[in-house]
């Protein structure tokens, strides 16, 4: 699954004020804090707590919020909050929580759970953030499938320092604040609160001489070309997951995923409804009246429809199997052709004369030539009885 929209996570609109964002976060944090949720639902509550914390950290910072509003998750700079800032890591623990609430949870919960998942060396390990990419394709491409290339901006491991963040020939040192633990304990009265170390941001290490290529981040922004296989029958809004092509993890953590979300261009002829297609077919007045064969378009060529004599405007003809075979469908949908009877325009004098003669002959025949008009006239008469 991709990362949820930060505004959706907090339950606020995109125009929410700082106070509204903070209030929404406090409410969610109180509800889902791990110390308040034990038993079967503990893990789900913990994930929601982390998700709300991440959303708040992003939207409470004006610069990060502006970048997120413009580019979404893909545009968030992982170094905006210093070398240890990792948006979307999902395992950052609860550090910073006490900073947002002051003494509230120190009084309520006591010791606070801390730290993210740790690797073999004791360092906190973070999964890279998921990225999203909107890809626009034609209806034909959606129906038949295609292979395409996309170029995306992404963060990759720095070639100079190989992801360490340290200048070549040097190395990171244990953090003197947390002594390499990545977390610190704060005393508040009778309570002890564990939170992410504010000095090393949970890494347990400090880089005395940062790499000049990545400024100590361990990763740099690059353009990456990826092959995307679009399956036949894909629909608007469906996503294709490219595993491991999101942002790289930190401290040996796994990379996130890239989700390619499909947008289908508006077609000049067809409208799609699930696996079915709809189109409007213009028909001359004379053909509708006299009947005859007409040619209609399909995604695989053209087909022929035999119009019966007296075809009315709005009549729908169904061509079975001429729609789209969806990804999870066993059979293709149908094509619905909606007749649009066209009234002739720009008539010559001779044509006008012929139509007037035809009109007079219709009037002499009464309502038998216009069944719809007859029923409408009867309804009007009934209305005024």
UniProtKB/Swiss-Prot annotation:
A zinc finger (CR-type) spans 145-223. Zn(2+) 2 binds at residues 175, 178, 197, 200. Its main location: cytoplasm. It comes from the Bacteria. Disulfide bonds: none annotated. Pfam families: DnaJ (PF00226), DnaJ_C (PF01556), DnaJ_CXXCXGXG (PF00684). Residues 35-48 have a biased composition (Basic and acidic residues). Residues 5-72 form the J domain. It is found in: Cytoplasm. Keywords: Chaperone, Cytoplasm, DNA replication, Metal-binding, Repeat, Stress response, Zinc, Zinc-finger. GO terms for cellular component: cytoplasm. The J domain is necessary and sufficient to stimulate DnaK ATPase activity. Zinc center 1 plays an important role in the autonomous, DnaK-independent chaperone activity of DnaJ. Zinc center 2 is essential for interaction with DnaK and for DnaJ activity. Participates actively in the response to hyperosmotic and heat shock by preventing the aggregation of stress-denatured proteins and by disaggregating proteins, also in an autonomous, DnaK-independent fashion. Unfolded proteins bind initially to DnaJ; upon interaction with the DnaJ-bound protein, DnaK hydrolyzes its bound ATP, resulting in the formation of a stable complex. GrpE releases ADP from DnaK; ATP binding to DnaK triggers the release of the substrate protein, thus completing the reaction cycle. Belongs to the DnaJ family. PANTHER family: CHAPERONE PROTEIN DNAJ, DNAJ HOMOLOG 1, MITOCHONDRIAL-RELATED. This is Chaperone protein DnaJ. It comes from Leptothrix cholodnii (strain ATCC 51168 / LMG 8142 / SP-6).
């Amino acid at each position: 699954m991709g990362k949820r929209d930060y505004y959706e996570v907090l339950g606020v609109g995109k125009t929410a004020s700082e106070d509204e964002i903070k209030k929404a976060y406090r409410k969610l944090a109180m509800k889902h804090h791990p110390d308040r949720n034990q038993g079967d639902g503990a893990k789900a509550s913990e994930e929601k707590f982390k998700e709300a914390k991440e959303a708040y950290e992003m939207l409470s910072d004006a610069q990060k919020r502006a970048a997120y509003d413009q580019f979404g998750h893909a545009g968030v700079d992982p170094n905006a909050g210093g070398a240890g800032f990792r948006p979307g890591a999902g395992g950052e623990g609860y550090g910073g929580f006490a900073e947002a609430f002051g003494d509230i949870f120190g009084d309520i919960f006591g010791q606070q759970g801390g730290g993210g998942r740790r690797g073999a060396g004791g360092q906190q390990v973070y999964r890279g953030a998921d990225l999203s990419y909107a890809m626009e394709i034609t209806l034909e491409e959606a129906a038949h499938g295609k292979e395409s290339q996309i170029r995306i901006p992404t963060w990759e491991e720095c070639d100079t320092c190989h992801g360490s963040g340290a200048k070549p020939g040097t190395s990171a040192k244990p953090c003197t604040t947390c002594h390499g633990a990545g977390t610190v304990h704060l005393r508040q009265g009778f309570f002890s609160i564990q939170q992410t170390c504010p000095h090393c941001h949970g890494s347990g290490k400090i880089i005395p001489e940062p790499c000049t290529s990545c400024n100590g981040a361990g990763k740099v922004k690059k353009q990456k070309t990826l092959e995307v296989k679009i399956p036949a029958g894909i629909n608007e809004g469906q996503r294709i997951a490219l595993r491991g092509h999101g942002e790289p993890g930190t401290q040996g953590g796994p990379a996130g995923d890239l989700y390619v979300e499909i947008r289908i261009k508006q077609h000049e002829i067809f409208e799609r409804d699930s696996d079915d297609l709809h189109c409007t077919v213009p028909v001359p007045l004379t053909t509708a009246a006299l009947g005859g064969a007409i040619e209609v378009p399909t995604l695989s060529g053209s087909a022929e429809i035999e119009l019966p004599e007296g075809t009315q405007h709005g009549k729908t003809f169904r061509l079975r199997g001429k729609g789209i075979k969806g990804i999870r469908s066993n059979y293709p949908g149908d094509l619905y052709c909606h007749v649009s009877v066209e009234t002739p325009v720009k008539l010559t004098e001779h044509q006008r004369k012929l139509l007037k003669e035809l009109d007079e002959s219709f009037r002499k025949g009464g309502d038998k030539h216009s069944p719809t008009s007859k029923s409408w006239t009867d309804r009007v008469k009934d209305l005024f009885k």
